[in-house]
Amino acid sequence: MNKLEEHYIVPKDVVAELDKYIIGQDEAKKLVSIALVNRYIRSRLPKEIKDEVMPKNIIMIGSTGIGKTEIARRLSKLIKAPFIKVEATKYTEVGYVGRDVESMVRDLMSIAVNMVKEEMYSTVRDDALVRTEERIVDSLFKGSSNSENMDPNEIKAEEKVKEKLRKKLRAGELDDTTIEIQISSKMPFSTIEIFTGGNFEEIDMGIGGLLGNIFDRKKKRELKIKKAKEIILAEELEKLVDHENISDIAKSKVENMGIIFIDEIDKIAAKNRSGNDVSREGVQRDILPIIEGSKVNTKYGIVDTSHILFIAAGAFNLAKPSDLIPELQGRFPIKVELKSLSIDDLKKILKQTKNSLIKQYVAMFKVYDLDLKFSEEAIDRIAELTFNMNLESENLGARRLHGVMEIVLADLFFEVPGSKLKKFEINLDYVNKKIQINEQKDLNYYII
């Protein structure tokens, strides 16, 4: 992880990180890692060449639940890049009621702004906590308000009392104490909603900045210290961060590191030129300029999409990538087909990934002080059952594991809370018993 954080990245390092969370799909992981590293290489090029190097956008082909979204999401987390997943079917052609395609860029920019804010908050959090503590202690302490007229002994005595209050505050002993504090009460005038081009859009009119001083009034409130700490800390964090740079840093992150994942791209692939297919083609033509590179107005400024990485995905059961308009196909030079999950893949997903499904359930039962274990035979049976159901009905990939696990563990979730049970093993017989009980029902109906 250190290499990734320091940006000394090579494709093998990226794949090694993805392997911790995603089973199989080696070809897809390899191609997205190359695309990521090439973006890093671009950032090191001279400006005249850098501007000419375009991102190698990717189309992932495969059914649901096999890792398409997770690969892109984990990739963005590794490099702390702004990431958004959108569904192609949610957008409409310009002139129709619905979301316009530029909103995906506006949403990505909002995500980036929040990311930058959180990064800035982390650097000033310690100072903000000290300030928060002092404000609460001052509210609690009823001593003199003018230290200039106090003699040294009085000042020392006051500081001793304050230090005792600080210790109690840090220990949580004062959480239920009620205090009166002054908090900011700003009027929410930063954005307004207007109706334009068949869409509701949020437009920043800058009113918050113009009238901020008028409507930023202080008001007194009585709150328990636990709640007051949250409010005061948020205020102090806002005071300490450099708001002028947030939008600029976020814009740079979006333009150079942003990732937009367009799911269900196959649903807007037009196989003929009539009826709904014409509308779908219209959405494709609206998406095209954004992928090619265009300037999009957001409430944080104009964003250039030329170097955003676009990853599209779809099952392509009823359509083929070649059914997309040729211009859009050309903007996705890399196409990779993800494989359906085997029984062995499902076993590994259950127990080998960093935050595997079994680890999650074991942790949940640990809250009830129950040590839950799964035998290897039980894991094999759960994987086999999931695989067979994916063959017999719609292939949901790893997502079906959740449904199977819930059926197997339903009685435990009901019985364990409040019981004295400390240890329990899920074995093959237990899994078969739970499955047989439910076989009288249509498992394909109940397990999704």
Curated annotation (Swiss-Prot):
Database matches in CDD domains: RecA-like_HslU (cd19498)
Protein's GO biological process: protein unfolding; proteolysis involved in protein catabolic process
Binding annotation for ATP: I23, G65, I66, G67, K68, T69, E70, D263, E327, R399
A Pfam family matched in the record: AAA_2
Compartmental location: Cytoplasm
GO cellular component, one term: cytosol
InterPro entries given in the database record: AAA+_ATPase, ATP-dep_Clp_protease_ClpX, ATPase_AAA_core, ATPase_dyneun-rel_AAA, Clp_ATPase_C, HslU, P-loop_NTPase
Subunit structure: A double ring-shaped homohexamer of HslV is capped on each side by a ring-shaped HslU homohexamer. The assembly of the HslU/HslV complex is dependent on binding of ATP.
Database matches in NCBIfam families: hslU, PRK05201.1
Name listed for the protein in its UniProt record: ATP-dependent protease ATPase subunit HslU
Species, as recorded: Borreliella burgdorferi (strain ATCC 35210 / DSM 4680 / CIP 102532 / B31) (Borrelia burgdorferi)
Lineage: Bacteria, Pseudomonadati, Spirochaetota, Spirochaetia, Spirochaetales
